[in-house]
């Protein structure tokens, strides 16, 4: 039995810091809801209390970070972004004192990417990781060609430097060499569609490479190529960690796809179809658009999409861990305060209605914090949705072990 309080800390530009009873509540959402999508921009909703006679020196676009205590020692940064909304209300006002509530919304780096343009000079044929790197570098670095030729330093605020001009994030760009998997796994066709939204173009590249572009709690952007998750160390969760109340699973007809089309270079396409699934559920078609260069890669992705979606999914949609619970270990708290997209999660302690065991990957997460409590809700996908394997309905009824290919397969392979 261990005791724990998250003791969240909120820090703004210039070192302005809030902690303890000045924090009402904090909620943070990051990642994605489905393995077939790309993550949306992360956001934080921060509620602070202060004296109404002392306005806070916070402004739109100011940087903000949120950190919480780890299980063992020290703090972990779980969010970094810029302020997008400021709302002020009064909880109390009178002769004996006043309380103002600041409700701040902050957004992560992907939201900033959505306000950038790239691609005016096009991109050569290259692999997915290289394309992602090039798009991000172009989006976040301001070059001389981006500057109005008539602009002079005298026309800018006195505190402006080249490093801060246009909110350029040099630290983020410098980190790309270690946070982006280069070159990637899939070759993409050349891009010559002209200047366009950076967020949309980089998501297309990531989706085409079956990778994922996500935001870390430290504010850096990460791109994991398709094979990256195989190297991650699994976290085992027990019934001491998981909040059983509220577990839910929903088998949805709308998620089933048994007739797949994948488009690639020059609007060519490849298809895949699962006849057993069609017999069971009817024809349920789905299309995935890519920037792939090679026909073999398009067929590979069509087959994988079909395998992962031709039958319903039956595992918990969300797993909630109350880090403040005395049954959660400090080691587990340390691992979860550093949660990331692609963290492998394993448990054998689910109620029987959920199949008892689950192995998969964290796709998204939501923090709900007060001074004393920390609930972390994990949105997960099953292992087979990233690295598909066969289910019984996909094996012909006439198949025998003696005739199965490859003959090195074992029961655990299916």
Where are the language model's segments positioned?
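Acidic, small/polar-enriched beta strand-loop surface segments
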Residues: 1-19, 123-130, 200-359, 367-372, ...
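Beta-strand-rich assembly/attachment modules of structural machines
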Residues: 1-126, 373, 381
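Generic structural motif
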Residues: 8-10, 23-28, 64-66, 174-184, ...
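Generic short alpha-helical hydrophobic face used as a protein-protein interaction/packing hotspot
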Residues: 50, 87, 110, 209, ...
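Glycine-centered loop/turn motifs
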Residues: 59-63, 194-195, 340-347
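Short coil-to-beta-strand transition motifs
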Residues: 72-82, 350-361
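Charged- and aromatic-enriched interaction segments used to assemble
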Residues: 75, 92-252
């Amino acid at each position: 039995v261990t005791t724990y309080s998250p003791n969240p800390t909120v820090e703004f530009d210039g070192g302005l810091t809030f902690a303890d009873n000045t924090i009402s509540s904090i909620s943070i959402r990051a990642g994605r809801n489905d393995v077939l999508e790309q993550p949306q921009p992360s956001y934080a909703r921060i509620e602070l209390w202060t004296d109404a006679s002392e306005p806070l020196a916070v402004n739109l676009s100011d940087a903000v970070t949120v950190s919480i205590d780890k299980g063992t020692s020290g703090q972990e940064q779980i969010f970094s972004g810029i302020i997008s909304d400021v709302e002020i209300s009064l909880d109390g006002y009178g002769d004996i004192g006043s309380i103002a509530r600041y409700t701040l919304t902050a957004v992560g780096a992907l939201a900033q990417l959505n306000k950038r343009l790239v691609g005016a000079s096009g991109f050569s044929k290259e692999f997915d990781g290289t394309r992602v790197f090039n798009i991000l570098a172009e989006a976040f670095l301001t070059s001389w060609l981006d500057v109005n030729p008539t602009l002079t330093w005298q026309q800018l605020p006195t505190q402006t430097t080249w490093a801060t001009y246009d909110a350029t994030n040099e630290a983020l760009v410098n980190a790309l060499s270690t946070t982006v998997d280069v070159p990637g796994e899939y070759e993409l066709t050349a891009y010559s569609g002209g200047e366009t939204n950076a967020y949309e173009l980089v998501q297309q590249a990531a989706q085409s490479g079956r990778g994922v572009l996500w935001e870390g709690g430290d504010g850096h952007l990460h791109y994991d190529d398709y094979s990256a998750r195989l190297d991650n160390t699994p976290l085992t969760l027990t019934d001491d960690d998981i909040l059983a109340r509220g577990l839910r699973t929903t088998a949805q007809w709308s998620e089933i796809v048994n007739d797949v089309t994948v488009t690639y270079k020059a609007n060519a396409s490849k298809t895949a179809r699962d006849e057993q699934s069609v017999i069971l559920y009817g024809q349920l078609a789905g299309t995935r658009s890519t920037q792939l260069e090679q026909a073999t890669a398009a067929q590979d992705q069509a087959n994988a999409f079909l395998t992962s979606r031709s039958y319903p999914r039956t595992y918990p949609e969300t797993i909630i861990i109350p880090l403040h619970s005395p049954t959660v270990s400090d080691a587990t708290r340390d691992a979860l305060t550093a949660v990331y997209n692609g963290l492998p999660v394993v448990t054998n302690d689910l109620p029987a209605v959920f199949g008892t065991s689950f192995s998969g990957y964290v796709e998204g997460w939501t923090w709900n914090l007060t001074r004393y409590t920390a609930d972390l809700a994990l949105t997960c996908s099953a292992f087979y949705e990233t690295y598909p394997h066969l289910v019984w309905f996909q094996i012909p009824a006439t198949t025998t072990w003696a005739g199965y290919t490859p003959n090195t397969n074992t029961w655990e392979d299916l």
